[in-house]
UniProtKB/Swiss-Prot annotation:
A Pfam family annotated for this UniProt entry: Histone_H2A_C
Taxonomic superkingdom: Eukaryota
Name of the encoding gene: H2Av2
Residue span of region Disordered: 1-180
SUPFAM superfamilies: Histone-fold (SSF47113)
Family in the record: Belongs to the histone H2A family.
Any one GO biological process: heterochromatin formation
GO cellular component term, pick one: nucleus
UniProt-recorded Gene Ontology molecular function terms: DNA binding; protein heterodimerization activity; structural constituent of chromatin
Bias (Low complexity) ranges: 44-59, 76-104, 115-138
Biased amino acid composition, Polar residues: 1-26
Sequence intervals crossing the membrane: none
Lineage: Eukaryota, Amoebozoa, Evosea, Eumycetozoa, Dictyostelia
Protein name (database record): Histone H2A.v2
């Protein structure tokens, strides 16, 4: 209300209050003080590595082929989108071998892999290109070798056997092991005579030559006895085998053997028959 042409206190205070309320509102909306690294990040737009559209789309992104300058190493072909579908198949198809690609100015075309049924993929084998066969050398089967059987006579004359033998002009000769009896030319073994001499201990020392002489004497005596006993066997005409009786008669009739073996008694050898000649039936010639 106006009175006496002067404004009231309320009308004067209203604009002041409005200014104060505006200042209070501004102070309430002021953001707190932030560090410089957060203030910089405010103006940088946030970008995600993967867009929302990539998760929503079911099909994978198509690979982009970049043109490259020809290099000495052969460039490998990139697979197309059909390769992703081939991985989800129940049985993976076997790779096909191809001839090595030569370096060219044009980029290689992507290789397409065709899907096959499980039955065909199991029976299919890796195919090789015709150029790989042409590069290989022509292989012919080896001819069968004929084997000849040789007789024993031809084997001895073969040069392989001659090489294994010792040379003709060899200085060393093969030594044949022989006993002392064979070297002395005796049938009675000298080693056995030596064993008996050393076992009976007739003397303290036994020379190696004494055994040889004793074996020679024994062999001579045995030969004499056998010769005389054969003569007695031929006179008896009753048996064809030398017996004790024949040996005893041969010793008693021989002068040297009877003097040597006078004290020897031969079992079942008998005695000399001492019959008077008048009792004997003499023949007409006697």
């Amino acid at each position: 209300m106006k009175s006496n042409g002067h404004p009231s206190n309320n009308s004067i205070n209203e604009p002041i209050k409005q200014q104060e309320t505006k200042q209070n509102n501004k102070s309430s909306h002021k953001t707190p003080h932030k560090p410089p690294y957060l203030a910089r990040a405010k103006f940088q737009p946030k970008t995600s590595s993967f867009s929302n559209s990539s998760f929503q789309s079911s099909t994978p992104p198509k690979p982009q082929i970049a043109l490259k300058s020809p290099s000495p190493s052969p460039s490998q072909p990139k697979t197309s989108s059909s390769s992703y579908s081939s991985l989800s198949s129940p049985s993976p198809s076997q790779p096909k071998t191809s001839s090595p690609s030569l370096p060219s100015s044009t980029p290689p075309k992507p290789r397409q892999i065709a899907l096959k049924s499980p039955s065909s993929s199991s029976s299919s084998q890796p195919k090789t290109s015709s150029s790989s066969y042409s590069s290989l050398p022509s292989s012919t089967p080896p001819k069968p070798q004929h084997i000849e059987l040789k007789s024993p006579s031809t084997v001895k004359k073969s040069p392989i056997v001659k090489k294994t033998n010792s040379p003709k002009g060899s200085k060393f000769k093969k030594t044949i092991r022989s006993s002392r009896s064979t070297r002395a030319g005796l049938t009675i073994s000298v080693s056995r005579v030596e064993k008996l001499l050393r076992g009976r201990r007739y003397s303290k020392r036994v020379s190696p030559t004494s055994c040889v002489f004793l074996a020679a004497v024994l062999e001579y005596m045995v030969l004499e006895l056998l010769e005389l006993s054969l003569n007695e066997l031929s006179l008896s005409k009753k048996s064809r085998r030398i017996k004790n009786r024949h040996i005893n008669l041969s010793i008693l009739k021989d002068v040297e053997l009877s003097a040597l073996l006078n004290d020897v008694i031969i079992c079942s050898g008998g005695v000399l028959s001492s019959i008077h000649p008048s009792l004997l039936k003499l023949k007409k010639d006697q």
